[in-house]
Amino acid sequence: MMHIIDRLTRPVLFAFDPERAHELSIAALKTGIPFCSGGVQNSKLAVSVAGLNFPNPIGMAAGYDKNAEIPDALLNLGFGFAECGTVTPKPQEGNPRPRIFRLTRDRAVINRLGFNNEGHAQALARLSLRKGKSGIVGVNIGANRDSSDRMADYEEGVRTFAAVASYLTINISSPNTTGLRGLQDRENLSELLQRVMRVRNEQAALIKRKVPVFLKIAPDLSEEALADIAQEVLEKGLDGLIVSNTTLSREGVSAPAASETGGLSGEPLFERSTIVLAKMRRLVGPALPIIGVGGVHSAETALEKMRAGADLVQLYTGMVFAGPGLPARIVSRLAAYAEANGLNSIAEIRDSNIKPWADRPLA
C-alpha cells in the first residue's frame, strides 16, 4: 500500500516547484491522515543515546518541519525521532525565491533557503502543546541573519526551548547565512559552546533536567578543523555531534542545476559525509553520541552510517525522492537485518567499518 502511495505522491508533488511541493506535503501531513502504519516495532532497534530512549535509530533531519508544525505526524511515518527547525529568535523570510532546486538525475537537492522560519514564539507555542506526549522531538536552533550578536541568539534558543525539546541542536554549519560557518573556527566555537552550555546548565536548575545539546557541523572541513571541533566538543561537555549539514561541493553531480548556489543534499553527499563521520568518531572516541546524516536513502545506507560510527541516523532528501513510506521501509528492513544476523541490538554494528571510511582523504 505504501509503495502505491509513494508512486502516486511523487508525480503530483513534482508537478510543482520544490518549495510549493514542500508546503503541500506539510499541509497534507497536518490533516492527520494516516499515510502509513508507522512501520514495525522491534526491541532490537531501540537505542539509548544521551539519556534518551529511541524506539529506532532513524530520524527526520532538520529543515523539513522548520516551524514545528508536524512533529507527531512525522513520528507516525515510522521515524524514531524528529528534529524541528532551524528556528531563529525573530521570524525571517530567508533568501529570495527560487531557492530550492531538484537535481532529479542525481537524486539530490540544492537549497539556499537562509533559515526562513516563523521565529521562536510560534515554534514554542506549538511545541508547548505537546506536553505529556510521547516521542522524541529535537529543536535545531540558529541565528538571525541581521543579528548583532549571533552567539546570543543561540543562548536565547537554548533558554527558549530547553523545557519543550527532547534535545537541542546548535546549527552553525548552514552555508546559506553569510558568515555563519565562521562560528566553527576554533576561537569562535570555544566561546559559543561555553556560552551555550552555561545557559543549558542554568536552565537545568529550573526545569530539573539537562536537555542534551548536539553540535551540527559541515562536511566541508579540513582534518585540522575536525580535530579542533572534536577537542572543543569534548572539553565543553556537549552531549553529541550531528555529521553533517549540506555541502558546497558539487562532486558527483551532473544535473544542469548544479551551478546554483547553496547547500547540496541527497545521494551525492553520502560519501563525503560518511568520511567526515568516521573521522569524527575516531577523534572523539567511542563514548560521545553521533548522529549521521547525509545521503541516506535506504536501509543499507543507514546501516553503513552506523558501521562508520553513528549511533543514530537522519534523512530528509531521500524521502523527497522515495516518498513518505521510506522511513517505515527502512525501519522494517533494519529489523529484518537484526533478526537475520542474530543481533541483540542494532547498536552492535556501530563502528564495525570505521577504518575504511576514516582512512580516506578529504579531497
Swiss-Prot record:
The keyword Nucleotide-binding belongs to this UniProt entry's keyword annotation: no
Annotated substrate binding sites: 66, 111-115, 171, 176, 245-246
Pathway: Pyrimidine metabolism; UMP biosynthesis via de novo pathway; orotate from (S)-dihydroorotate (quinone route): step 1/1
Leader peptide range in chain numbering: none
Active site per database record: 174
Residues at which FMN binds: 62-66, 86, 140, 171, 216, 244, 266, 295, 316-317
Cofactor note: Binds 1 FMN per subunit.
Keyword Membrane listed: yes
Annotated SUPFAM superfamilies: FMN-linked oxidoreductases
Classification via Pfam families: DHO_dh (PF01180)
Cofactor: FMN
GO cellular component, one term: cytoplasm
Record's bilayer topology term: Peripheral membrane protein
Subcellular location per the Swiss-Prot or TrEMBL entry: Cell membrane
Keyword vocabulary terms for this entry: Cell membrane, Flavoprotein, FMN, Membrane, Oxidoreductase, Pyrimidine biosynthesis
GO molecular function, one term: dihydroorotate dehydrogenase (quinone) activity
GO biological process: 'de novo' pyrimidine nucleobase biosynthetic process; 'de novo' UMP biosynthetic process
Catalytic activity from the UniProt record: (S)-dihydroorotate + a quinone = orotate + a quinol
Top-level taxon of origin: Bacteria
Function comment: Catalyzes the conversion of dihydroorotate to orotate with quinone as electron acceptor.
Similarity-based family: Belongs to the dihydroorotate dehydrogenase family. Type 2 subfamily.
Entries under HAMAP family matching the protein: DHO_dh_type2 (MF_00225)
Assembly with partners or alone: Monomer.
Record-given protein name: Dihydroorotate dehydrogenase (quinone)
Gene assigned in the entry: pyrD
